Amino acid sequence: LFLLVVFCGCSRPTELTSPDGNIKLVFNLNEAGVMTYGVSVGGKPFITPSAMGFEGRDGLNLSKDFQIENTEFTTKDETWTQPWGENKSIRNHYNEMAVRLKDPANTRLTLRFRVFDDGLGFRYEYQVPQVDSVFVMDELTSFNLAQDGKSWSIPASFETYELLYRTLPVSKVDNANTPMTFKTDNGVYASIHEAALTDFPEMTLKHTEGCHF
């Protein structure tokens, strides 16, 4: 669906915008090395600061004690042809920010964000010393929506995706399989989904409070 070379004991906000400037993502690393991200659309908050990271087995923590090694910005604008679909040619135009982090145990984590004119995505790329796999116990990635609205989703289920879609206020969704599509009260349509799962568990959305998942 993700150069600053000096870390200090203070918050470190880093920003990335869509090519047309309408969507802005802000990444922040606080004094404890904890990561959050936030998103605004058209200058208005869309996702308020939300947690990132994972907790693994045997004390592995991919959510705190990190320092920024460097941050790299790139832009890509290309057109590719899909074999079938509504449109034959697809424009792939985005700005990318790769935030490279390291903790005291020399665990390295790259957060790769891509912001398009019509959405954004991010992914985790991690390298843990002396292990060939990571047993994930908890995913801390959250989506703290700034506004309520109308949503369309199916209930979270580990057995099937063949369930009836329900229409509910975002704040009334207790859990959901992705994609969860919604329209905020100020008219922004969006959908939360995942992609490129390689040897990794699928995600479900769990309501915590308000419009937070």
List the predicted regions and their residue ranges:
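N-terminal accessory beta-strand-rich subdomains and adjacent acidic, glycine-rich linkers
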Residues: 13-213
